[in-house]
Amino acid sequence: MNTFLFLTAFLTFVEFNCENLFDFRHDSLKNDIEFTPEGDRKWTERKYWNKLNNISKAIISCGIDGKDWHLPDLVALCEVENDSVMRDLTKRSLLRNANYEYLVTNSPDERGIDVALIYDPMHFQPIRHYPLRIKPMEGMRPTRDILYVAGRIITDDTLHIFVVHAPSRYGGEKPTRPHRMLIAKTLCGAIDSIRLASSDPNIIIAGDFNDYADSKALMQLQLHGMKNASHDAKGSNGAKATYKYKGEWNSIDHIMVSQRLYGMKVFGRINDQTFMLEPDEKYGGVQPYRTYRAWRYRNGYSDHLPLVVRFALKQPD
């Protein structure tokens, strides 16, 4: 009789909407003039580097786990402008010694907003990656690509990752609902393709869905066997969700995982370190500490808070 000793390795996954992580240079092909020195935000090189280091600090703090600390293994980011921003974030900011690598989309979004995946190559080795382009339906503006990445994790299993930033509710929730359903339909098709090749795959879908856990789009993913690993996530310093609007906490950011990974979940939480919060003077309690309040520069972090989910992976010794 053969006896195997299984060791536990942990994988920490973070999702974070950075809120307008733009560089300070104008892209003539995009509507990004607002975030330039001449634009309405007076977005200078100094403000840009402040923002990069603030986002870095937020990511680093996601690794705090009680008395222990470790850098996240994978970080899904929304609202990053381009490859140049990601290079500065991973190679020149406070993250420069973390040895992170990254993958980023180049979407047709009119403002130039993209999604990206940061990864520790010691714990995740990409095998293939490509964008899933969303063909706009009638009345829908060009939107962000979905980033798909498949890679090897420490157990030598394949992990499939989708990074999503779904169309917003601007113009009303009901009129824009089909836009987000289109994202869900695209993801369900991709999941089906993966399952044709693997009966029990490891899948993570993470990002800003601009929808709640009980929305039709999220329910469609659940009907396709995905579980919401962040449904019970709470902060420890007053955050009840990742996003606060007019005094109401709501989670529009989600980390959805396949059944197999859901069984490996250790915890899901909101990273609401006190330095990422400020008093909510109008509605009470606290709120995310943003880069701007209206048009006033605050040198904050984001209007979203990061989600953190940790998994325990079994590997044979």
PLM ranges: what are they?
Residues 189-203, 210-317:
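Metal-dependent phosphoester-hydrolase catalytic domains
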Residues 82-84, 110-112, 169-171, 210-216, ...:
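Active-site environment of divalent metal-dependent phosphoester hydrolases
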Residues 37-48, 71-77, 104-105, 135-137, ...:
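Second-shell loop/turn segments in exported
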Residues 74, 80-166:
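Structured beta-strand-rich core segments of catalytic domains in phosphoester-bond hydrolases
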Residues 9-95, 103-115, 185, 282-285, ...:
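N-terminal, active-site-proximal structural segment of metallo-dependent hydrolase catalytic domains
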Residues 16-19, 78-80, 104-108, 120-121, ...:
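Active-site-proximal beta-strand/loop segments in catalytic clefts of secreted hydrolases
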Residues 29-32, 157, 162-176:
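Active-site His/acidic residue clusters
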